[in-house]
Amino acid sequence: MAISDWPEAERPREKLIQKGATVLSDAELLAIFLRTGITGKSAVELARNLLTHFGSLTKLCAANLHEFSKLPGMGPAKFAQLQAVMEMARRALAEELKSGDIMDSPQSVRSYLRLSLGGKPHEVFVGIFLDARHRTIMIEELFRGTLTQASVYPREVVKRALYHNAAAMIFAHNHPSGVAEPSRADEMLTQSLKQALALVDVKVLDHFVIGNNETVSFAERGLI
């Protein structure tokens, strides 16, 4: 049955307008983005198929064009639309992070990092460079690795901190496995970075590990 034949209160777009986006399921939100289904499938059914295929909304949003286009009804146009939506969300969150003390917006930091790093098939290590008032100077990808690890060099991080004239930093990296639990190696690396940056009077405020459905803060766990 086409969505237009559904009771009005059950149609995703009408439900969003009447009750707000937060009440919609992932499939309903995705259906609004897709706008139309394909032969034999409504937009909601197609959205459910996409989520089942990729395993989660995070992994769907992180898929490349080749993976995305394998599914019926998906192609370059829909892929470009999805990437544009994702980039607008990232930029909006980045603007918020640059508007004041980053420590006053912990949820915005988590949201930005999950949107930027969640679901990636390889490990990415990011640095957020801050001034003395903890305002964002720059958000920069520092290292990129493989499915299991990224090689991080404290000396290079110190160079970038000096280049940006940073007074403090926040680090983040993803776990492609989807599990956000920090490893012993993550803890040791964080301490190495903290010690190296202390030599140039740069504080490490936090280190986030990003999984598919969770973000772990070293500071909250007392690991900084």
From Swiss-Prot:
Gene Ontology molecular functions: metal ion binding; metallopeptidase activity
Keyword annotations from UniProtKB, A to Z: Hydrolase, Metal-binding, Metalloprotease, Protease, Zinc
Motif (JAMM motif): 173-186
Name under which the protein is recorded: UPF0758 protein Neut_0782
Binding site for Zn(2+): 173, 175, 186
Alphabetized InterPro entries for the sequence: MPN (IPR037518), RadC_JAB (IPR025657), RuvA_2-like (IPR010994), UPF0758 (IPR001405), UPF0758_CS (IPR020891), UPF0758_N (IPR046778)
Source organism superkingdom: Bacteria
Segments forming domain MPN: 102-224
SUPFAM superfamilies referenced in this protein's UniProt entry, alphabetically: RuvA domain 2-like (SSF47781)
CDD domains for this protein: MPN_DUF2466
Biological source species: Nitrosomonas eutropha (strain DSM 101675 / C91 / Nm57)
